Structure formats: C-alpha cells, structure tokens
Amino acid sequence: MKKRFLSVIVLSAALFSVQAQEGKGGISPEMLGQIKQSYQGTAADKALRNAIGNNDIRKLALNQENMQGMDTHFSIKVESKGITDQKSSGRCWLFTGLNVMRAKTLAEYGFQSFEFSEVYPFFWDQLEKANLFLQGIIDTSKSPLTDKTVEWLFQHPLSDGGTFTGVADIVSKYGLVPKDAMPETNSSENTSRMANLISLKLKEYGLQLRDMAAAGAKPEALEKEKTTMLGTIYRMLVLNLGVPPTEFDYVRHDAKGNPVETEHHTPMSFLEKYGDKQLLTNYVMLMNDPSREYYKCYEIDYDRHRYDGKNWTYVNLPVEEIKEMAIASLKDSTMMYFSCDVGKFLNSERGLLDVKNYDYESLMGTTFGMDKKQRIQTFSSGSSHAMTLMAVDLNKDEIGRAHV
C-alpha cells in the first residue's frame, strides 16, 4: 500500500512537470528570441551600458534642466530656531511632532534656543510597543501561528517608526523633559542594533506566552508573566537609553540667553508649562490616498504606540483640501506635521525634493507611467518620512514650494 501511494505521488509529479513544460505561460525559445531583439546594441546602447555599469544610476539621471538656482523666499513662514537631528534612527515622527510644539514654545517664551528631549518619549514609546506586542500575542493566543494577525505581530514586534498619533499618546501619558534632562545616546541615534535585540527577545517571549496559553494558563498568570518580561525589556532600554527622570531642575533663560529662574519639574508639569497638553484633542490626522474613498475616516488596527492608545486613524481627503488646511495652519503660526514618500526624488545635496530631480525615463528609454493611486495600489509608494512643514510660498493662492 505504501509503495503504491509513493508511485502515485511520483507519477503525479512527473505529469505536472510535463504539463508545466508544455503549457503556456513560460518563456519559449521563440519568445526569448523576440525579447532579445529589444536590445539592439547600437552605439547609443553601448554608451549607456558603459555609463550605467560604472556609475550610480541616480547621478546619471540627475536632471540638469532642474538644477537652476532655488528661490528661498516664502510668503508664509512660522519662525523657529535651530535644527533637531534624528541621526541614524527612524524617529522622524517623534522629532516632527516635538518640533511642532517646540516652535510654539520658542515663540511664547522668546527663548534663544530650546529643545525637548527626544530620548525621553522614545524610551516610553519602545516600552509601550513591547507591551502592545506581548498583549497582542495573549489576545490572539487561540489563533494558529499562520493567522494573519499573529503573523503580522511576529513580523512587527517593535519599530522605531511611528505617526503623530504616537506623539500624542506617549506625551499625554508620560509628559516631556528638556534635552539636558535626558540627552541622546549612541543607541538612540543609531537604533537598529537595539531594536533588533529587543525584537528578538520579544519574539521569544511571544512564543512562551502562546505555550502558556495553550497549556491552559489563566489570564492572571499570563499578565504576571508579561509583567516580568517587560521588566527585562525595561532593563534593556535603560542600558541603551538611560533612566527616564521622574523629577528635575530646569534653568529658564531669557531672550538674551541669561539665566532667569531655576524651576523644579516633573515630566507632566513640564508638559503642562512648555508643551501642548491638548495633543489628543487639538489635532487630527489627514491623508491623501486616492486608492480609497474620500471623506471617510480610516483606522489601522494594531498600528498604534500603546495597547490602550489610539490606532493610526486618519480622514482621507483630496490633496487640494489638505493644501488649503496647511496654508491655514501656517497663517495661524502653527507648523504642520507632514509626511510623504521622500527617498525616490530627494536631492539631498541640494536639499530639494522634486519629482523633476531625476530623469530615469530618458536614461532607461522607457516611461514610468503609474499615477499616485496606482503606485499606492501596487505598494510602489507610501509615506516614508515625517517632516515639519514650516513655510510655503504662494502663487495665486496655491502652494508653489514648501519649506520643511
């Protein structure tokens, strides 16, 4: 019986192999001949091949017609002082959200310089995300490992990326501290190694929690074990980022940089005085996604920073209306949290983001014709980097260029 079964399997595999070879859909010799004709090997083809084979494609595609001088005048601008630097980390969302608040603080108090600690909220963000993962594992413990939600959790146990919703959720719960109270570390400026180690530990813990649940552990036991696990994650975060302060002294300076007063604060009292305590109610997230219906609110489950926080939630609007709101926000002296697909057409040497920066079509001898809707539908484009929109230049009431 066993030999017969094996013979059937072998025969079926052989038949499938023959059908695959003889069936339509593969590249036949005739088709390959037609395909090869697309490269003629002309002098122009050879020159392009030599150039592309020995150079960075991006440099060759740099559009010289778009290299004229840049006009740095902006008709509407929110003033700020200094530049904050996320270094080699994915904390753009956090720096951007804090910069929106920082501009208001600089304007209100007339400080020469001022910066919130980005490490402080990032510490709590990572701990909260670890809890989000572990609790998500507990919630889905009855589902198989092949379940889509379970797969997503194990694929995304921890990230240093985020959205403005995360800024609001973390800051409203833990408060803020000045830069000096919790300064940058090597791990905060270069997050990948720390994130990889914590993610590896979380995945290990996730499997342990699933095993406990499968063995019949009660919710109280799972909660207790999760708390112990988070203790290990907390220690790892302290080793990498430092101990978050619970109270501190802050020396306030006047507009000339002279010390005026030493204030004693907790993170929540510092938020109360120098930050925006209405982050959860004063702001909404807007999105332009032409692949989905406009004038509707969308929510992405588990894409949040706290288990008890708010999912990434946004109102989908035509881009023209979002531009109008951006102008209104800047006219109201409020910078705007802004994100888009940055990497493809950013000329970092000039500090210019323009779809005309690189002419890949002329270089490759073909067109890239998908519109925004099609690029989103095919996962070819998406929001990749958050920035603070601080100025625009208007041309007949429309945005001609922007400063971020």
Question: Residue locations for each model-derived region?
Answer:
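Short, flexible loop/turn elements at secondary-structure junctions
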Residues: 82, 87, 96-99, 120-127, ...
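Conserved small/polar residues in nucleotide/adenosyl-binding loops
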Residues: 402-404
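Beta-sheet entry/capping signal
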Residues: 82, 91, 118-120, 335-337, ...
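Active-site nucleophilic cysteine motif
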Residues: 87-101, 158-165, 385-386
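N-terminal regions that are enriched for targeting/export leaders
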Residues: 22-82
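Active-site-surrounding "flap" and adjacent substrate/cofactor-binding loops of secreted or lumenal enzymes
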Residues: 69, 105-136
